[in-house]
């Protein structure tokens, strides 16, 4: 059985279905988890269910605050070993009906925010000479889906970005991988 004892883990989007399952799994494997999300009630529920978890409300769409956020996370956890970029949104619409804002917002949150989280986490991981990043993408990033051109593009971009980051930092003992789930409830 894998053991994450002593590993400090940041999970974004921790209050949704996949994020919640990740929190539970990492805690069951003795990881030290800091869970983030934008829903205060759900974060409070996580804290009640798992008193030893760290929770922090944070909106990843505010890129100007991501560097300070990572600094805060590493202070709370006393380091950062694993980043799981799970936060993301959908704004489904057929391409001809899709508003510019729907396109931009999905790309901005799913792809751009993930890049900035990786960038600032990698700075910390380089100092520790160790790091693991897992970006939660989607099967839609590989296949496309009706009414999800923005979401598919954002997830495909995450895959390509992750491959590039993996190549850049492999020799520094930092791995970057993707998990592409199918449809969930």
Q: For each predicted feature, which ranges?
A:
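Substrate-binding pocket helix/loop in short-chain dehydrogenase/reductase
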Residues: 94-95, 99-107
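Alpha-helical segment proximal to the catalytic Tyr-Lys
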Residues: 123, 167-171
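Residue(s) in the substrate-gating loop at a strand-loop-helix junction
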Residues: 138
């Amino acid at each position: 059985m894998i053991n994450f004892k002593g590993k400090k883990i940041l999970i974004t989007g921790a209050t949704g279905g996949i994020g919640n399952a990740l929190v539970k799994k990492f805690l069951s494997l003795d990881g030290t988890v800091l869970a983030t999300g934008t829903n205060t009630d759900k974060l409070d529920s996580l804290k009640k269910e798992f008193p030893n978890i760290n929770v922090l409300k944070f909106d990843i769409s505010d890129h100007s605050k991501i560097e300070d956020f990572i600094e805060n996370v590493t202070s709370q956890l006393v380091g950062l070993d694993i980043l799981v970029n799970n936060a993301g949104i959908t704004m489904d619409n057929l391409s001809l009906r899709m508003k510019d804002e729907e396109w931009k917002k999905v790309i901005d949150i799913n792809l751009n925010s993930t890049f900035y989280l990786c960038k600032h986490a990698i700075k910390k991981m380089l100092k520790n000479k160790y790091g693991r990043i897992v970006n939660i993408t989607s099967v839609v990033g590989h296949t496309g889906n009706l009414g999800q051109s923005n979401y598919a593009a954002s997830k495909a971009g995450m895959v390509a970005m992750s491959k590039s980051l993996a190549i850049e930092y492999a020799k520094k003992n930092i791995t970057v991988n993707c998990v592409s789930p199918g449809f969930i409830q």
